[in-house]
Amino acid sequence: MFLKQSTASQEVVIGPFLDEDDGKTAETGLTISNTDIRLSKAGANIVAKNSGGGTHDELGFYQITLDATDTNTVGELLIAVHKSGALPVFKYCYVLEEAIYDA
């Protein structure tokens, strides 16, 4: 997934979050805060997402909104979440400069 650098309100779907015991049951009632969502920008140290958590969509998939702070670094963006009761979830996105994104 491609994201535009330093741009607010970019929606990303992450998941599925599956039960850590059976590995197949969708976890649909998790409370995911911004500090649960960890980001690594272009290979840098992992930090908490700036603000806003995750909202369940369906089937264990959650929507998160990235803001301009979350997307201020060009390159690979790793999104990682590990909530108690669920297996870890990872997603890779790529942040592009505005001129490249809009081309």
Named regions from a protein language model:
Residues 1-103:
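Polar, enzyme-active/binding microenvironments
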